[in-house]
Amino acid sequence: MPVLHNRISNDALKAKMLAESEPRTTISFYKYFHIADPKATRDALYQLFTALNVFGRVYLAHEGINAQISVPASNVKTFRAQLYAFDSALDGLRLNIALDDDGKSFWVLRMKVRDRIVADGIDDPHFDASNVGEYLQAAEVNAMLDDPDALFIDMRNHYEYEVGHFENALEIPADTFREQLPKAVEMMQAHKDKKIVMYCTGGIRCEKASAWMKHNGFNKVWHIEGGIIEYARKAREQGLPVRFIGKNFVFDERMGERISDEIIAHCHQCGAPCDSHTNCKNDGCHLLFIQCPVCAEKYKGCCSEICCEESALPPEEQRRRRAGRENGNKIFNKSRGRLNTTLGIPDPTE
């Protein structure tokens, strides 16, 4: 029976990937469609992807598939053909090709079955996720940006919006997509007469969000086809002005794709212009935050002096200190400081 999960250490896999000479292509895609048996589908796709040396992160659920992957350049054509042939619902599926890609985005294949491909918190049995808003292409996006009756809503997390967004786009102040959905409805109640344009990284969140807005009585709803990634690609190909400012945060080793030259964020430690996210090098922290090169050297890649000191301790002492700590999702929020703080480690700005 084939092995349907990875058995090699992360360090060994990363070293193997970095030693590869063949270029890789980072691809993301999603599809909302009914999967009767997600577990069987997962196992079949795992074998297909493994045979083509595909790395990345793939989620499957009864509602569909969501994938961010890295494919050897020589296998991209074969991968596309086999994916399209795997299920009729996937035939002709749009694949978002990364914009700013060094091919080192992933080094292991992780494929999981979940309740939803995007955690939305929706439990309304009458919600129809297929009743989505209209798609917008690149030229239409630019026209909407100039329309005084249009409102752009960013359906990404605060740390994504912080480093890049469309001109005058509205940020929904939340830390997760499930928190954003009810807030978006609440914030837009006074603007039901407006044209609402929703966007996200690759389209998966704004597509569902557009359906949620329509479910809640909003009739003028659009969303950007393929999200920021596809918009920027098509705008460049068509010689259109790219109206997205800054960097597009991505959920892989790169942590961002450069869309425009503007740097609109700041180092969370010293305030210098910077839009480079990193995770605190202290294994007892791993806070996601923005750090400039000067502070990276000063704090040795850590978010605070305490983390810097702790990361320099012998490994056994570090493990002893980590024992019993809360291991939550730690993200620095510029307005509220640290979220789900690791016990005993202060906010880096204090």
UniProtKB/Swiss-Prot annotation:
Q: Which SMART domains match?
A: RHOD
The UniProt keyword set, sorted, is: Oxidoreductase, tRNA processing
Annotated Rhodanese domain ranges read 146-240
Give the positions the UniProt entry annotates as the active site: C200 (cysteine persulfide intermediate)
TM ranges: none
Question: Might you give the EC number(s) for this enzyme?
Answer: 1.14.-.-
Q: State the SUPFAM superfamilies in the record.
A: Rhodanese/Cell cycle control phosphatase
Q: Which Gene3D superfamilies match?
A: 3.30.70.100, Rhodanese-like domain (3.40.250.10)
Q: Which reaction(s) are listed as its catalytic activity?
A: uridine(34) in tRNA + AH2 + O2 = 5-hydroxyuridine(34) in tRNA + A + H2O
Example GO biological process term? tRNA modification
Single GO molecular function: oxidoreductase activity, acting on paired donors, with incorporation or reduction of molecular oxygen
The organism's place on the tree of life at top rank: Bacteria
Q: Which InterPro entries match?
A: Rhodanese-like_dom, Rhodanese-like_dom_sf, Rhodanese_C, TrhO, TRHO_N
Q: What does this protein do?
A: Catalyzes oxygen-dependent 5-hydroxyuridine (ho5U) modification at position 34 in tRNAs, the first step in 5-carboxymethoxyuridine (cmo5U) biosynthesis. May be part of an alternate pathway, which is able to bypass cmo5U biogenesis in a subset of tRNAs under aerobic conditions.
Record PANTHER family: TRNA URIDINE(34) HYDROXYLASE, UPF0176 PROTEIN YCEA
The entry's family comment says:
Belongs to the TrhO family.
Q: What is the protein's given name?
A: tRNA uridine(34) hydroxylase
The record lists the organism as Escherichia coli O157:H7
